[in-house]
């Protein structure tokens, strides 16, 4: 445990510059809901069946999105259709690409600045503010096992194929990993969740890092696998978790999928994972100043500023020092206005305990 305690500053930084504000979250929910309405209306107008349900996924659902100066936010909102509802006019099942094209056409709205585009695993709707909504499309199949129980499977329209997948399982995995407190309400009471967001913030703290570093799900998996809890010390928990992650990535860059054991999020030698490991090495080197015997609050604040490419921590140190000086300033000036009696003052009660 480092001598200089920066937990207060780290919690403040997370609250003010990492965590999304309620207003930002509300705006994103509004865009998401408008997109759902637009898709329903477009499909209805074309005479196509509607999705049976929508389900938010990814960092939005896991509550691990972080603030971005360029509003480069990615909201994943899955659309789930019954397989029997995804047929063409001849009654043949639609291919994965054809389904994405149908959804893209249904989202068409002349009032929007950008048309939706078909991507490999989703249909993407861009917005002028900088962020976008990705709509992965799933089809649901239902069969029976030998005991006549229902078996429900989900397939993602990926490329030209339908592949077994359901991102909601990843959300469940993360929520189970960080604790039940994440499943109730807006409050952020989990240290591991804060560490996840702080790590993502660091990984994207420079424009030159954003396009080179690894994905949010890879970072989340690495944090969960290597998390080091430090009660009431988010600064120590963050640093120790980073050390553990770097050690793992020095041995192997392969990151296993949290749900599907036959898949990997990243393979050996993955360039984005290697870049993330190098970034970790840089920031951990910067933080070595915390171990010096003569480390001060200012030095610690400057180090954390460099790590996150911010001025927040040093500003807090300046504010704290100003407050301390005002509290400790001698009251010499005030004595001039004080007057003292020239005669003995008798106490108004007897000595001792009354």
Task: Go through each PLM region and give its residues.
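Conserved catalytic core of two-metal-ion nucleotidyltransferases
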Residues: 26, 39-43, 62, 94-147
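Terminal (often C-terminal) interaction modules
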Residues: 1-14, 254-354
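Glycine-rich, often proline-containing surface loops adjacent to acidic residues and nearby aromatics
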Residues: 11, 73-85, 170-182, 197, ...
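N-terminal regions immediately upstream of nucleotidyltransferase
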Residues: 1-72, 79-98, 353
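Extracellular structured ligand-interaction cores
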Residues: 72, 76, 120-122, 130-134, ...
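Extended hydrophobic secondary-structure segments that form protein cores and membrane-embedded regions
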Residues: 53-58, 124-127, 218-222
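Conserved nucleotidyltransferase catalytic core and NTase-mimicking acidic/glycine-rich helix/loop elements
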Residues: 187-299, 303
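Extended, alpha-helix-rich binding/interface surfaces that flank or overlap catalytic cores
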Residues: 66, 131-197, 350-351
């Amino acid at each position: 445990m480092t001598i200089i305690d920066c937990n207060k500053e780290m919690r403040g930084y997370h609250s003010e510059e990492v965590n999304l504000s309620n207003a930002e979250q509300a705006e994103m929910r509004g865009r998401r809901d408008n997109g759902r309405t637009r898709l329903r209306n477009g499909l209805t107008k074309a005479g196509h069946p509607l999705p049976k349900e929508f389900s938010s996924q990814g960092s939005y659902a896991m509550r691990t999105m972080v603030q971005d100066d360029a509003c480069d936010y990615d909201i994943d909102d899955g659309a789930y259709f019954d397989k029997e509802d995804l047929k063409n006019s001849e009654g043949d099942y639609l291919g994965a690409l054809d389904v994405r094209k149908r959804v893209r056409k249904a989202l068409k709205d002349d009032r929007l600045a950008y048309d939706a585009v078909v991507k490999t695993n989703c249909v993407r709707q861009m917005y002028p503010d900088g962020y976008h909504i990705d709509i992965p499309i799933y089809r649901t199949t239902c069969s029976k096992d030998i005991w006549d129980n229902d078996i429900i499977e989900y397939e993602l329209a990926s490329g030209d194929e339908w592949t077994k997948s359901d991102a909601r399982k990843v959300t469940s995995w993360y929520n189970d990993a960080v604790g039940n407190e994440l499943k109730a309400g807006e409050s952020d009471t989990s240290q591991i969740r804060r560490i996840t967001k702080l790590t993502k913030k660091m990984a994207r703290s420079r424009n030159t890092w954003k396009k080179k570093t690894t994905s949010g799900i890879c970072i989340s998996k690495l944090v969960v696998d290597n998390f080091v809890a430090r009660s009431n010390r988010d600064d120590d928990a963050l640093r120790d978790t980073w050390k553990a992650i770097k050690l793992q990535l020095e041995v192997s860059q392969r990151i296993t999928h949290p749900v599907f054991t036959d898949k990997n999020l990243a393979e050996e030698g993955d360039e984005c994972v290697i870049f993330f490991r190098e970034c970790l090495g840089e920031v951990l080197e910067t933080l070595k100043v915390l171990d010096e015997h003569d480390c001060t609050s200012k030095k610690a604040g400057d180090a954390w500023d460099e790590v996150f490419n911010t001025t927040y921590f040093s500003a807090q140190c300046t504010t704290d020092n100003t407050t301390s000086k005002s509290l400790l300033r001698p009251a010499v000036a005030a004595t001039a206005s004080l007057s003292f009696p020239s005669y003995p003052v008798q106490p108004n009660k007897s000595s001792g305990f009354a």
